[in-house]
């Protein structure tokens, strides 16, 4: 059965930015601060390293009853029995991913336009990651998405939307009244010296919108 997901504060990992010794430590601190969902994103490591990292991170997420999503790698997601997988526009098509993972896993898709959003929803996405909303150092090649486009996406799809890309605690208020379901955060949590406090502050800002 597909898990019920709270998308509100969604940490996307980046080992190059983390302020802690280990990724597991960063993830646990973020969860203690209020992160409700974790995505393990590893772009520059071997399959074995990714798998081993996923096993260790899943021990932390399982301990706190927080779902783990794997970025891009359907095989890793299935191997560690993660809650689901997240794919981008240049990854395996969402419809194929859905066939592989079945109906009991969560499928997230990165989108930046209404057309991409509608296509993702049609192909079985459970949620959309919309952005990049602002310029970001973590994905320098990411196309930007306007607030107007975000509103159009919200009006045209019924599945949950999380926004991503350059979001920090001071920008959360920009999304007031749009109807987003969560914030996908990288550096504004994982790069902070005090990860737990950073997550708490973002959660407090999200509650206001």
Swiss-Prot record:
GO cellular component: a single term: cytoplasm
Q: Which GO terms describe its biological process?
A: thiamine biosynthetic process; thiamine diphosphate biosynthetic process
Keyword Ribonucleoprotein (UniProt) = no
Tell me which UniProt keywords the record has, alphabetically: Magnesium, Metal-binding, Thiamine biosynthesis, Transferase
Cofactor entry: Mg(2+)
Among the GO molecular function terms of this UniProt record, one is: thiamine-phosphate diphosphorylase activity
Q: Which InterPro entries does the UniProt entry name for this protein?
A: Aldolase_TIM, ThiamineP_synth_sf, ThiamineP_synth_TenI, TMP_synthase
| Reactions listed under catalytic activity | 2-[(2R,5Z)-2-carboxy-4-methylthiazol-5(2H)-ylidene]ethyl phosphate + 4-amino-2-methyl-5-(diphosphooxymethyl)pyrimidine + 2 H(+) = thiamine phosphate + CO2 + diphosphate; 2-(2-carboxy-4-methylthiazol-5-yl)ethyl phosphate + 4-amino-2-methyl-5-(diphosphooxymethyl)pyrimidine + 2 H(+) = thiamine phosphate + CO2 + diphosphate; 4-methyl-5-(2-phosphooxyethyl)-thiazole + 4-amino-2-methyl-5-(diphosphooxymethyl)pyrimidine + H(+) = thiamine phosphate + diphosphate
- Enzyme Commission code(s) on record: 2.5.1.3
* Amino acids binding 2-[(2R,5Z)-2-carboxy-4-methylthiazol-5(2H)-ylidene]ethyl phosphate: 136-138, 166, 186-187
Which pathway is recorded for this entry? Cofactor biosynthesis; thiamine diphosphate biosynthesis; thiamine phosphate from 4-amino-2-methyl-5-diphosphomethylpyrimidine and 4-methyl-5-(2-phosphoethyl)-thiazole: step 1/1
What enzyme class is recorded for this protein? transferase
**Note on how the cofactor is bound:** Binds 1 Mg(2+) ion per subunit.
Residue positions annotated to bind Mg(2+) are 72, 91
The residues listed in the UniProt record as binding 4-amino-2-methyl-5-(diphosphooxymethyl)pyrimidine, with positions renumbered to this chain, are: 39-43, 71, 110, 139
Q: Where are the transmembrane segments?
A: none
Q: Which HAMAP family match?
A: TMP_synthase
Its biological purpose = Condenses 4-methyl-5-(beta-hydroxyethyl)thiazole monophosphate (THZ-P) and 2-methyl-4-amino-5-hydroxymethyl pyrimidine pyrophosphate (HMP-PP) to form thiamine monophosphate (TMP).
What's this protein's family per the entry?
Answer: Belongs to the thiamine-phosphate synthase family.
Cross-referenced NCBIfam families: thiE
Q: What is this protein called?
A: Thiamine-phosphate synthase
Q: Which gene encodes it?
A: thiE
